[in-house]
Amino acid sequence: MTSPGPQDLVVTQASLDDWPVISGWAADEGWNPGLSDGPSFFAQDPGGFFLGRIDGEPVSAISVVNYGGDYAFLGCYLVRPDLRGRGYGLATWKAALAHAEGRTIGLDGVVAQQSNYRQSGFELAHRTIRFNGTAPAGEADPEVRPAQPADLDALTAYDSACYPADRPLFLQRWLTGAGHRAFLRRTEGRVTGYGVIRPARDALRIGPLFADTAEDAQALFTALTADATGSEVAIDIPETNAAGIALVEKLGFTPSFETARMYTGPVRPFASERVFGVTTLELG
């Protein structure tokens, strides 16, 4: 009997109900997905998630999430381990990429796939390093407080300066997701940074951590981890942010994983020096 091939694969848009399958595969890869990421992800682009099926059984996944008219982000590129090497991943990739409709696409690629991404037109921007460690006890900063609904406009504006696209729909959900805790720092009445920590499969995840200065980032980091003293925490930091890496290394965090931020073309200028921790590897 002939084994099913790519010609037998049916790729369709995934729904939020399919998210447990996708996030389960991601967890099996050691990516430590957040426990309540799905609603925030689908809020940004409900049509940006795809599953490949053979005879109705999920075998592959990918997301191509659009932000406005110029930018998209690719993630969740997965094939069931026992079915790799049969062309299902590439077939899923080709079917889903059309969703970007000419936008510049970004991704955070695992080491094993980076050469394939280069062949598909992606160029390296920088490495992103995941650091893991135990949340330390710290002294609260009076300028840091939990984010409130009234802060949404200010945080959306700050976020837009630190990311290559506006993402108000995503941010509104991300700040208030189940188990998510968001903090901001105001100095002289102006937002100088914000961050979010959330529960995940293996370790608490911080992301984003956007801040004007290392001092702002340190104050936010302390607030984010205040209720997690002794728990394992993970944060993904662009290698270009030496101050961010120094901050976590000082706390005893060590590298555990790396990806490469890659783009297919130019992106809107943003304050990359403020990115002390990326939001997610799946949606950028």
Residue locations for each model-derived region?
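Hydrophobic alpha-helical segments and helix pairs
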Residues: 91-141
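Intrinsically disordered, low-complexity, positively biased terminal segments
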Residues: 2-8, 15-20, 40, 53-54, ...
